[in-house]
Amino acid sequence: MKLLVLYRPNSEFARTVEEFIQTLRVQQNIDERQLEILDFDSREGSATASLYDIIAQPGFVVVGDDGGFIKSWQGNELPLAEEVASYTLSY
């Protein structure tokens, strides 16, 4: 299972997203193998956003080991860290 995080590092949401990522790492024990952070405007980030229909940033996508879509959240209201962790750790 992997969590993809798509955001613009120089946006007004950057600090909030980075704090959220830190919360996932510390409180929810999400490690680097389960987390991929992408710049929304990079080639890879843009392709990933298109693949999973993420049109607003920040975007969070939980995918299976095969890359299959499981759950996503997007926009300025972040999901609860516990909810993200439950999807990431239970599949």
Where are these regions (language model features)?
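Structural micro-motif
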Residues: 52-62
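Surface-exposed, flexible loop/turn segments at secondary-structure boundaries
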Residues: 11, 43, 68
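Local sequence-structure signature of Cys/Sec-based thiol-disulfide redox active-site neighborhoods
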Residues: 1-30
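Non-catalytic, surface beta->alpha helical segment in thiol-disulfide oxidoreductase systems
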Residues: 62-91
